[in-house]
Amino acid sequence: MLQPKKTKYDKRHKGRIKGNATRGTKLCFGKYGLKSLDPGWITDRQIESARVAATRYMKRQGQLWLNIFPDKPVTKKPQEVRMGKGKGVRDHWVSVVKPGRVLIEVDGVDLLMGKEALRLASQKLPVRTKFIIKNA
């Protein structure tokens, strides 16, 4: 799974997702992409699942880029533990996504294959997405 090699602090505040994305809103590497329409947290497992779904469909053709990285730790307390006594231990990592952010890019495949690969990837993600084409 994706996670940072080293972090300055173990735990982070939950935070709020306000507004639209200002960075990463245009295609940089590929010809086709998947853009988020909703705000949300995407876990490391969901990112990996989307990547596997898209690459399996493309069958080693073309290239795929992940434009998001899970850099926010999410903590969880054990089951049946009373409230208080500090924050729980780090459970998994998430990527905070705002609307308008390009999540995945694909190149080196035709339009139909790229669209279907990204559709399969989008089914693994917890946010609504749309298919975008470079210069269209």
UniProtKB/Swiss-Prot annotation:
It comes from the Bacteria. SUPFAM superfamilies: Ribosomal protein L16p/L10e. GO terms for cellular component: cytosolic large ribosomal subunit. One of its GO terms (biological process) is translation. GO terms for molecular function: rRNA binding; structural constituent of ribosome; tRNA binding. InterPro entries: Ribosomal_uL16, Ribosomal_uL16_bact-type, Ribosomal_uL16_CS, Ribosomal_uL16_dom, Ribosomal_uL16_sf. Disulfide bonds: none annotated. It holds the Pfam family Ribosomal_L16. Keywords: Ribonucleoprotein, Ribosomal protein, RNA-binding, rRNA-binding, tRNA-binding. Binds 23S rRNA and is also seen to make contacts with the A and possibly P site tRNAs. Belongs to the universal ribosomal protein uL16 family. Part of the 50S ribosomal subunit. This is Large ribosomal subunit protein uL16. It comes from Karelsulcia muelleri (strain GWSS) (Sulcia muelleri).
